[in-house]
């Protein structure tokens, strides 16, 4: 394999194995070249990735030395992607009866999910995250996107237990918007003691559901790494949680004029 061919293949390999430690000896054998050649390739890839804002390439010395690619986006690109999605949310045909917002097409488009996943993963890439948690059903594609970039598993909390998940742990929680007591469940095999859990969801009003998932994290003797939501909806009153990050925020839904006031979420407050 010629060097230019190897560089293309190597670059693709790194991108498809984010946050994984790759052994230099194994890479040398795979490409049938000396470790010094692999190191030279990495210098070139590292420079291009950092200049283009693709991610960070780190090398680790020693006989068992390796390389790790950590994808990230610049704050400017994160802001740009959020504004692109905000424009979609401002479309007047998104307003549903009762003041709800139609999100299925946005959360069903892979390119949008990739953007949402990148923004959330960028916010938490320097923190220890072992597992991503969400609740069925619309939070699942977001959780999968974030988990893929962080290279960690994701677990799904359900409101109704599934027989295929075996023994479960259940908690009751108070819905923040309707003040009803509801139930959520998670398989006992999903989490291990001491894991750092990042909670993600598609939409938040009173934060009752997220508060319930937070209770589940503590019931499993795990640690909360953070809470991130795609869209923060308008809510009159006090939310059940105040420590969270949101990509976008809906300040007001004007049903009469069929307009939605969409602003950037607090994830951009310090950027």
From Swiss-Prot:
GO terms for molecular function: DNA binding. Induction: Autoregulated. SUPFAM superfamilies: PRTase-like (SSF53271), Winged helix' DNA-binding domain (SSF46785). One of its GO terms (biological process) is negative regulation of DNA-templated transcription. Gene3D superfamilies: 3.40.50.2020, Winged helix-like DNA-binding domain superfamily/Winged helix DNA-binding domain. It comes from the Bacteria. Homodimer. Contains an N-terminal DNA-binding winged helix-turn-helix domain and a C-terminal regulatory domain (or effector binding domain) resembling phosphoribosyltransferase (PRT) domain. However, the PRT domain lacks enzymatic activity and serves a purely regulatory role by binding effector molecules. PANTHER family: HYPOXANTHINE/GUANINE PHOSPHORIBOSYLTRANSFERASE (PTHR43864), PUR OPERON REPRESSOR (PTHR43864:SF2). This is Purine biosynthesis transcriptional activator PurR. The gene is purR.
């Amino acid at each position: 394999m010629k060097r230019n061919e190897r560089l293309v293949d190597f670059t693709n390999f790194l991108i498809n194995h984010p946050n994984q430690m790759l052994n230099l000896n194994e890479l040398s054998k795979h490409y049938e070249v000396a470790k010094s050649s692999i190191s030279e390739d990495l210098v070139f890839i590292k420079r291009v990735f950092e200049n283009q804002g693709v991610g960070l390439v780190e090398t680790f010395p020693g006989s068992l030395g390796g390389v790790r690619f950590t994808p990230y986006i610049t704050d400017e690109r994160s802001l740009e992607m959020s504004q692109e999605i905000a424009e979609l949310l401002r479309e007047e045909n998104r307003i549903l009866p009762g003041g709800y917002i139609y999100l299925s097409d946005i959360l069903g488009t892979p390119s949008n999910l990739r953007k949402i996943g990148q923004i959330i993963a960028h916010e938490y890439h320097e923190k220890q995250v072992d597992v991503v948690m969400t609740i069925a059903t619309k939070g699942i594609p977001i959780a999968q996107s974030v988990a893929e970039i962080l290279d960690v598993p994701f677990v799904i909390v359900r409101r109704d237990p599934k027989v295929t998940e075996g023994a479960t742990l259940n908690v009751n929680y108070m819905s923040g918007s309707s003040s009803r007591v509801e139930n959520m469940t998670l398989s006992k095999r999903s989490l291990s003691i001491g894991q750092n859990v990042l909670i993600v969801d598609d939409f938040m009003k009173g934060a009752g559901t997220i508060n319930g998932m937070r209770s589940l994290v503590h019931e499993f003797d795990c640690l909360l790494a953070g809470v991130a939501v795609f869209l923060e909806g308008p809510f009159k009153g006090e939310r059940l949680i105040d420590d969270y990050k949101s990509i976008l925020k809906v300040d007001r839904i004007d049903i009469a004029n069929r307009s939605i006031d969409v602003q950037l979420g607090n994830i951009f407050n310090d950027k």
